[in-house]
């Protein structure tokens, strides 16, 4: 029983570390993408598409009047 708990705990920590490293890499990729002017244009186009159709698909919050 102890070895099973030990193994599961080890797997949990390895998974947490892997997720943390993946998140850091993803954030670095996002920062890199923001620095590229072509990628910024695509990002702005995607945002404007969400802005136009976001409320219809539930992607944008409704404004309170």
UniProtKB/Swiss-Prot annotation:
Q: What does this protein do?
A: Antimicrobial peptide. Has activity against the Gram-positive bacterium S.aureus (MIC=6 uM) and the Gram-negative bacterium E.coli (MIC=3 uM). Lacks hemolytic activity against human erythrocytes.
Family note: Belongs to the frog skin active peptide (FSAP) family. Brevinin subfamily.
The subcellular location is:
Secreted
Q: Where is this region: Disordered?
A: 26-65
Specify the propeptide location in this chain: 23-47
For bias type Acidic residues, the affected ranges are: 26-43
Top-level taxon in the UniProt lineage: Eukaryota
Query: What is the residue range of the signal peptide feature?
Result: 1-22
Share an example GO biological-process annotation for this protein.
Answer: defense response to Gram-negative bacterium
User: What is the protein name for this chain?
Assistant: Dybowskin-2CDYa
Against InterPro entries, the record matches this protein to: Frog_antimicrobial_propeptide (IPR004275)
Q: In which tissues is it expressed?
A: Expressed by the skin glands.
């Amino acid at each position: 029983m102890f070895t099973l708990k030990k193994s599961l705990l080890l797997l949990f920590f390895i998974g947490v570390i892997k997720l943390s490293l993946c998140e850091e890499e993803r954030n670095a990729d996002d920062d890199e993408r923001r620095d590229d002017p072509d990628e910024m244009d695509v990002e702005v186009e995607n945002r404007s598409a969400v802005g136009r159709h976001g409320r219809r698909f539930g992607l944008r919050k409704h404004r309170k009047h």
